[in-house]
Each structure stands twice: as structure tokens, then as C-alpha cells.
Amino acid sequence: MFASGARVAVGVSGGADSVCLLHALVELGGLKLSVLHVDHGLRGAESRADAEFVGELAARMGLPFCLREVTLGPGNVEQEGRRARLRFFHEQLAAGNCDRVALGHTRSDQAETVLFRFLRGSGTAGLAGIRPVTAEGIVRPLIELERAEIEEYLRERQIPWREDATNAGEEFARNRIRHGLLPQLAAEWNPALVETLAHTAEFARAEEAYWAGEIDRLSAESLTAGDGCVLIRTESLKALSLAVARRLVRRAIQMAKGDLRGVDFGHVERVVELASAPTGRGRTQVPGLDVRRSFEWLRLGVPFTRKPYSLKPLVPGTTQIPGTRNGISLELIEKSETSVLPWNVYNTEMGCLDWKRLAGSLELRNWRFGDQYQPMGLTGSEKIKTLFQLQRIPVWERAQWPVLTDGESIVWTRRFGPAAGFAAGPESGVVLKLGEVTIR
Amino acid sequence: MFASGARVAVGVSGGADSVCLLHALVELGGLKLSVLHVDHGLRGAESRADAEFVGELAARMGLPFCLREVTLGPGNVEQEGRRARLRFFHEQLAAGNCDRVALGHTRSDQAETVLFRFLRGSGTAGLAGIRPVTAEGIVRPLIELERAEIEEYLRERQIPWREDATNAGEEFARNRIRHGLLPQLAAEWNPALVETLAHTAEFARAEEAYWAGEIDRLSAESLTAGDGCVLIRTESLKALSLAVARRLVRRAIQMAKGDLRGVDFGHVERVVELASAPTGRGRTQVPGLDVRRSFEWLRLGVPFTRKPYSLKPLVPGTTQIPGTRNGISLELIEKSETSVLPWNVYNTEMGCLDWKRLAGSLELRNWRFGDQYQPMGLTGSEKIKTLFQLQRIPVWERAQWPVLTDGESIVWTRRFGPAAGFAAGPESGVVLKLGEVTIR
């Protein structure tokens, strides 16, 4: 949890757990201790008195004392308080003011957390409960002790602590579990329930650690971050066992929206089902995300919108496609230079147009429903939408799909290339060469 | 769950769930249905009436009816009843009397099971709850419906059912969950608790399916079945992530004792710790198993005992080592035959003795504490115990370790070979060649 000589800041509320922790760490010795306290100012004079109590305790022990006063945002007071404290502790660590922040959570807290999450339904991740050590540097040395043992320690040594009035109030879910449900379940079902739930957490924590490694590996293989979205090939998801697929989808959701807040079993399930459905389209919602299936792809992200554009392209030059990081480059090449441009280049996907056949009023715009033209190699005109279907282009890629027109005629579009009537050939004198580039 | 035309036997207790199931399957059509009923005879006339009710129902529907009367063993009546029913259903499947046995378990049963197991503390395996389909052929078509939906179905169709008196009794854990705890938790914590717990089960079931495959693969690699025991190399266990190591240990315990009854988190944990401890020895208990560490090995099995033996070995011939499937073969080879026995053979692990140097009173016995001799290559006499240490021979292998004596002298022992003073050499006329063989 900490090396000898480490600078350990102890979060002390003034309650039994954290007061015990502070005394125990002083007794242990060999650490550079300091005391942190957060005053939420929620209970007025009482809050003030807690802060003074902790300040005096630190002073008596000759330890540096750091008080943070916070004003809580609206919403769940219990949750907001917890977040404000964690934010403060993480700041202290990030600022290098200490090597570790030690908190007084006990096995009783662990059991309460696991029970609460079980009732809310939160898979193994939730059952893993409170972590004894976090990557950020928070440690919880009392996590294997029960609250009764803590109070015994304090009474034996006649160490005073403050009863937090909020700890008794039934309005907090935590207190209803602590004083109501947990003792009831222990009495009626399992006298060792606190220990049992701590084991459940420990088991789940190891499982989660295993999965984190597995899913890191798989997401590097199978998830692609796009513009404001994450893409998954449905085939790679279908190849996985259901448990792994579910976890990979959770990871994709987390990547796409930054967290997993509000995401439940049903959301994940519907995404997995969308990937396995035989039809290559469909849609489902995850809080904060739009999930679309198109052919072999799933897209998780903010809903994509069509941003119409109509530009005079630079010749020569590169014109950025609005709403994307791609640009269309246009270049004029004279006949005399054809030695560096073999004829077969005319048949590449990007293609070349015969400059003489163009009237010169070029427009670069996005694909529109109903667009049609005759690409080289086809015997007649075809709707671009049909070409999209044939080439399995996902719907979200179509929105900004570039089309080059000359007057009324489509002379080129991405992927399907030059129009048969405008394509450059051996007889062309001046060639307009098209390319697509990524703009950083 | 079942193919069209399948022969489906429906387990009907007479209660709402199973009566609903039977009607629903009749409605569904396309199946060859029959009705199974188990009478535990627990509630005398009432049990009888249940059986008659179900029999009459089957008759009215024109379905074959099979009644099994059982007498329950001592112990937990609820558990014994469940086991007796399952035994009967498995018999029916094994005998080929039906393709599937359909049971009336609902999502409400699922939630009760998950909650009960959570309170008892049973990792993901327990949280997986009731399986909708088992490998043996039991199916539970109502597993996604709640009990209220079942009763609605029956009331709408005015179908009567029997209220099982045992379902109301508070003496059964199941009933205390059904009528007490689950409604309380739903009211106080999560109105959708039954659904939440069903999802927990579904999630856990997929995880377990994944793990079953992983652990099958790993146990084929890392577990060795020995005489009444299972062996694991500690190195292969230490190389695994904790979650995987725990699951592999559970598998090893299951292999060694046939089931996992009575095995809890702490047992598994102590075995994993025994494997990771830096000292190469130690011991822990798992219900029904003795777990020993010796050097790089863990042995899980019935405690090994030393079975003393002292035999006149057959010359020539093979003598079985008592308590093992190994035998020591002794063979006499004349000088004239040395052409087929090159000299370097004398120096193999098994070795050869010079027949002339032996007084002839050979004894084959197990190693005794204090035994010592001078193997070839050592400059003096050495305790065999020291040689065991040097060669890292696990303690359980030492118990029946064979030693060959001639009068007072040890002339040979397994692995360490002939004694320097008795080993055959180029000058030997007649050679006693030793070998060890497996006896099937």
C-alpha cells in the first residue's frame, strides 16, 4: 500500500474509521503523515465543529493539516459529497503534495457497497466494490477490518471520535443499508454476511482485472475510433463468446461516450443483438449514444448528421470536405508529361478526367438522394445509392460522400470514379487528376 | 429449447407455474407431450390430492401420465425434494422415455435463486442461477416470465391450479425469500428487482460458459491426475492471473473430490496462496481433501499414507511396489552377452549391480527415515533424505520410494542408482540389471 518513508495524506472526517486509521498509521511509524479534511458545509455549525475537531487532532499529533471547503452542486447530496472528496484527494496526488492518500473505508463499507450494487444490478464490475489500492494512489488500509473492530480499537485506547449526524439519517441509501438492511440480512440469512460480501468483492475484483487485460487486447484489435464515434466490425463481435462480446461492447460504449453512466444490461444486450442480426441494418439507443448498424459495421457515437456543402474546388489544390478530415486534391497534367503517368493510372479508383471535355464550372458537393451517373465500366447510368448498396458502404459514410459535377453532369465520385463520358484516355491532351488526402 | 415433434415430458406439480406450462405447450402444438409428477408423500392426503389433480388434468388432455412416488432421505426436506425430482427427470431422459423434460421455473424463481446464492456467497457460478436449458435435456420455457404473468394467463383462461401448502410455510428458505425478502427489497430498493436479478443471472451464465472453455483448456495443460489425487505445478498456477488461478484451483478440487460441495472462497484462496508462497512446503485443508505443497508441486487428494513393505524381489522378474502401479524389474545378464549391453548403460539412472558382490539376501522395501548410502559419483555416504531435497522430490513420492538392500547395505535406490561399492563395471562377470515399469 505504501513504501516506508512515503508521504501519506490521511483523509480524516472525524468519524471512527478515519480517526482510527490516523492513529494506526502514527502507531505504525515510518511514514510522513499529513491530514486532509473536506468541509461540505452541509450541516452548518456541526460541519464546522467536525473540521475543528480534526484540525485539533492533527495539531496535537504535530501533523500538517489541510482543510478544503467545498460547495456541493445540486443533486444527490451523498453522491456529490463523495465525488467532491475524491476530486480533492486526486488533486492532492496529481499536484505531488503526497505519494498516497489513505482513506478509512472498512470491510463494512465494502459489504454495504456490494449489497447496494447487487440490488441495483451491476454485473461483476459493480460487485468488485471498493478497491483497496487505486492506480491514482488512493489506499484503504482498513479494508479488511469490520467497523466493530475499529470501535474496539478506539475504545481500548480511549480515543474520542465524532459521530457524523448524517450517518444516522435514514434519507441516505448508505445509512439504510448500514443500519437496516445489512444487519437484517445478517440476522436472517448469514451471520458472516459482511465477510461473505467482502469475498464476493475480492473475487469480482480479480475477475475484472483479468478482463481489463483481455479487453485491452481485443479492443486494440477490433475497435476503431472515428470522428466522434467508435466502429466495430460485426464479424469480430460475432466470433467472440457472449461474455467477451458483452464486455467488448461495454468498452466500445465507454470509449464512445467517455463513461458508462446510465448503461445497463439491456443496452449492452441490444447492441450485441444488433451486431448478430442477419439483416445488415438497424439502430438502438444507449444513453448519450446513437448505435447504428450498416452492413458489417456497428457505429456508436453521436448521431451523424448530413452537413450539406457545395464548393468551387481549387484547381490545382486541395479542397477539404466539410465535417470530415478528408480533402479532394485536383491536379492538371499536360500531355507532354504523360511519360510519368502511365495509361493504366486512368483506371484507378481515384481516376483522371479529360480536361477538354469539362465545361469548367466544377462543383464539389455531397451526394444527394437520387444522384445517378455512368461510371467507367458500366454499360448505362446507375443510381449512386445502388452503388453504395453493392459496395456495402455504411450509411454514415454516405452523408458527406463527395461528388464532382460539371454543370448538370456528375463527372466523378469517390470510390466509383470518373464518369464514362468524361474520363481521360490515351487521346487526352490535358488531364485533371483526382486524389483524396487526409488533412490533419 | 425443443425441435418440432419432440417428445417433451412436462414436470407438473399442480401449482400455477407448471399447470400454465402444460397448457401453454398444448396450445403451442407440434410436440408429443406427456406429464410427469413426483409425489414426495410429505403432506399425506394433500400430496395425494395433488397427484390426483395432475393425473386428472393429464387424462382430460389425453396425455400419458407418469407418477413417481418417492420417500425422502433425512436432512433438508426442501433440498431433498428438489434432488429427488431432478433424479427422476434425469432418469426419464437417460432411459430415452422423452427428448426433453420441461419444467415450470419462472423468472421469479430465477431471482429468488440468485438472491439466495448471493447471500450465501457463491461467486459468478452461483449467480448464474437456474439454467434455461441443460446439457441433460431439461428445459425451462417460462424462465423469462414472472409469476404474476403466469397467474394472469391462468385466470384469463379460467384454468384451475392447486396452491401448494408448502409454498406458504415460512420454514422453507425459498418461501421466506419469495414472500418476505424479495418483495421487501423490491419495495425499498428496486421495483424491477426480479428483472435485475434475472439479468445478473444471464450475465453470470455467459461468463461461466466462457470460463468453462478456458478452464477446460488450461486444466488439460496444467493438471495431472495421479493415484487418488490431482497434481499442479506451482509455476503454471503462478503464471496465471489471479482470477484464472482461482478458477483452475476450483477445477482441480472438483477433479480430486468429485464435486465442490462445502468449498468456499477461503479454501480456494488458501490453495492459491500455498502455491505462491516462496517456501516450497506447506499444507491446507479443503473439505474432503488434503492439500500439500512440496517444492514446485501441489497435491490435492486424500492424505497419502506410508504403506510399509519389505519383499523378497523376484530374480529374474518384476516385483510390484505396494500401494502404487509401479514395479521393479530385475534381470541377470551374463558377461558373454555384454555385446548387447554397452558399458555406458552401467551409468544410467536405473543402473546395474555386480552380481558377484551381492551376498544374495536381497530385500525390496520402502525408504526409511535415516537411510543412507554412497551412490556412484559421490565421494562419501549421504542420507537419502538429503538427496530427496537436492533433487526436489515431493514428500508424497517418498513414502513408497523403493530401496534395494543386500543384508545391511543399501545397494540401490530409485533415481539415485547403484551404490558405488556394488555397481557393475567392465570387470563384472554377471550383471543384475534394474528397471522400473508401470503395471496396468
Swiss-Prot record, chains A, B:
GO terms for biological process: tRNA modification. It is found in: Cytoplasm. InterPro entries: Lysidine-tRNA-synth_C, Rossmann-like_a/b/a_fold, TilS/TtcA_N, tRNA_Ile_lys_synt, tRNA_Ile_lys_synt_N, tRNA_Ile_lys_synt_subst-bd. It catalyses: cytidine(34) in tRNA(Ile2) + L-lysine + ATP = lysidine(34) in tRNA(Ile2) + AMP + diphosphate + H(+). ATP binds at S13, G14, G15, A16, D17, S18. GO terms for cellular component: cytoplasm. GO terms for molecular function: ATP binding; tRNA(Ile)-lysidine synthase activity. Gene3D superfamilies: 1.20.59.20, HUPs. Its main location: cytoplasm. Its EC number is 6.3.4.19. It is an enzyme of class 6 (ligase). Keywords: ATP-binding, Cytoplasm, Ligase, Nucleotide-binding, tRNA processing. SMART domains: TilS_C (SM00977). HAMAP family: tRNA_Ile_lys_synt. Belongs to the tRNA(Ile)-lysidine synthase family. The N-terminal region contains the highly conserved SGGXDS motif, predicted to be a P-loop motif involved in ATP binding. Ligates lysine onto the cytidine present at position 34 of the AUA codon-specific tRNA(Ile) that contains the anticodon CAU, in an ATP-dependent manner. Cytidine is converted to lysidine, thus changing the amino acid specificity of the tRNA from methionine to isoleucine. This is tRNA(Ile)-lysidine synthase. It comes from Solibacter usitatus (strain Ellin6076).
